[in-house]
Amino acid sequence: MKRNILFNRGKLLLPSLVAGIGFWKFMKARYEANPDYIVHFIKKYAESKDISLFIHHNDEKIAEVNSTVQLPLASTVKIIMAIEYAQQAAEGLMDPDQKVQIADIEKFYIPKTDGGAHEAWLSQVGTSGNVPLCEVVNGMIAYSSNANTDYLMNLLGLDSINSVPKSLGIPNHEPLYPISASLFIPSTLMKEKNFTRKETLHAIEKMEMAEYRSWALAINERWKSKPPTEQEKKEATKLLSLDFQKIWSDRLSRATTKDYVSIMKILNNKMDLDQHVHEHLDPIMEQLMKNPSNRKWLLHAGQKGGSTAFVLTVAMYATDRDGNRTELALFSNNLSSMNQEKLTRSLNDFQLQILTNPKFRDFIKENFAIS
């Protein structure tokens, strides 16, 4: 039986500033899927602490590399958002069917900053009128729309969202903060402080994380009464050269693969969260189960990934129809464009091998000295 996993990862990069189409085609032709590549890559870069892997299979540790090192999560952090939405929906605090105006979401949309995620979502739901709240959440997870994410942050409340990790037994997860608004920090500093580009870069580089988050929150608050104009959005993105993108990427909320495997276990066992929560959460998180081929051999499975120009992350869980349970988290940072492309192309096959091939799991344990 052919077994399929569709790896849908959300991009948080500005692709037009990272690589040209011709270069991408070159890499597409050159780098084919190779699950062994991920193993060799992790072994090569493990000492740098820029790569982290944690895998459990039927409660057995298959691999653990830098599992307590905090790394930027990119869009994988949206799992926390989905959990808070499901909890509020289960408690009757949110109505999944309530109508949300597309125009209210668009104020948070910054063109060319999410790899086309938001536009892809809009192509499905339309660009005018309204959609049910559950579809906004679906757009955040299935398409990885940052605009949907920031809209939901304001709706659900950041205090409630940031209480989720602790409620799941994860005390050191860094706080979430508005993604789109943080992209406006450089242009806002330049205007309000009358900084040059160089002065702005220096100011953000030395800024403490608490202050950085405060700027993002303040910008987000302003947008509630005065959304950014299209011209302001163009000016903000024009400033986001690769050096600004790197600072932004490094300052995204961080956590560990050990943290996220713990969360994946909670989502996988279907016992720790109230069943009413799962009624709202599973249709959002388990996009993989929309594929009929996956339903033939998987009981349930979910995942969320993310990337920037420098980061690639994924967290997933699965239980197959024989009752085998797998939880996996892989986080990486400071990637070259070539390494990121090779990892991305190999990740789906790597996950499939972990889920279905005992010999590959033994190979993983041997390479990472898990006895």
Role assignments for model-derived ranges:
Residues N4-P15, M27-I42, I62, R222-S371:
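Structured C-terminal helix/loop/strand segments within mature extracytoplasmic catalytic/sensor domains
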Residues F26-I80, E84-M190:
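Active-site-adjacent loops and short helices of periplasmic peptidoglycan-processing enzymes
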Residues A89-D95, N130-S144, S187-E205, M209-W223, ...:
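Hydrophobic transmembrane alpha-helix bundles
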Residues E91-V100, G139-S144, I179-L183, E192-F195, ...:
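Noncatalytic linker/hinge segments flanking ATPase motor cores
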